[in-house]
Structure formats: structure tokens, C-alpha cells
Amino acid sequence: MSELKITDVKTYIVPPSFDGKKRWCDNKTFLFVKLETNKGIDGWGECYVLRDRERCIELYIKEMKRYLVDFDPSRIKFFQDWVYNSFAEGRPGIDLFCAISGIEIAMWDIMGKYYNTPVYNLLGGPVHDKLRLYANLSTHGYKSPEEVAEQAKEMVAMGFTAVKMYPFDFGESDDEVYERVVKVREAIGNETELMIDIWRKAQPDQAVNIAKRIEPLRIT
């Protein structure tokens, strides 16, 4: 328990830039949560959002506001138990999980500022001195393997030494998926690490077949 109390809950939707570059971040909407407190300490959190459902997630946050005002933000575990078991009659779905994520992050942000320490210290201390950064290559909206490969090449030129791609799409043949991976590997060379995310779009037998075919391409 602490002397802190939440006094207001605000949301901010940041639309995508749509600058035509087709990068993941340029086509993604962001949803931020701001928790204000009686001690002048504000906490910020970012919600995971799904395309076309940003307003639904924001609405969940607004519905939770009446429960969050006057709530002690240090009681993060209590908040988790309550929201999963009691809010919305204890029947949470993906949109609610997205809303919860931003609120919880904002609570941790408040407590880090309150105790004047990085949040990782509140979670048990640091584990790594540094983390590997990789480029997340979106294939949404691309019409050809060459377009995907060109975007990957641009990311390597920016300094990334590892790229993750999503080569599968619903209804595509194994040959189409394989060609997309081959083109990206050719574009980024053998020194750059290449990762594959199936993202629930492949049937088990298709995933096994593709895995065998791309094995020589040095997939991380």
C-alpha cells in the first residue's frame, strides 16, 4: 500500500503515418494510457492493439476508469486479479487483455518514478546488460517477393544485423512462401540473421515441408 491514488485516466490514439513506405510502424496505430495521481506522478503505458479494434480497446479503458480513480497504483497484483476475475463479469477477451497491458505498464511506470528507480529493480533486478535488436519485417500489403526483399535490404542498410519476416499468408502455396524467403535471403546476404515467424498461418504439414526446404538458407 502507498499514499498514491489515481486521479484520472486518459487515452491517446496515434494514427499511422501512411507515408507509403510499408514499414510495420508506418501502418500501425498506437494507443497510449496516461494515469495521473494525487502526488503529481504520471504513469504512461502502451496497449497492444489490433488493426480496426483500437477504439474497442480504448473503450475498455474508459469503462475501467470509474474503478481506477482513487485506486492505489502500487496494488498491481490486486488489479490483475480483479480485472481478470471480476471486470466484465469475469469473461475477458483479447481486447480487454490489450487494455490491461497498457494500464499495468502505466502503474509500473508510476511506481518506478515514486521510488526513483528503474522498473526492472522493482521486478527483481536486471538480467541483461544489453539486448539484441532486430528488424521486424512486415509483409502486409506487399504484392511480390521482390518488394519484401527490397524492404529487408533497406533495413540492413539502416544497420540491423538481424531480420524477422512473416512469409506465410492464408491460401498460399509452398512455392510462393519459399520464393519469398529465398528473395529475402538473397537481398540481405548470409551475414545477416534471418528469422521466420509462421504466425498461425500454416497448416502443420505445410510448416514441416517449408522448414525442410528453407533449412539450407540458414534460418535462425
Question: Model segments located where?
Answer:
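Structured beta-strand/loop patches that form or line metal/cofactor-binding pockets in enzymes
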Residues: 1-44, 48-49
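Metal-dependent enolase-superfamily TIM-barrel catalytic cores that perform enediolate-based chemistry
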Residues: 129-130, 134-220
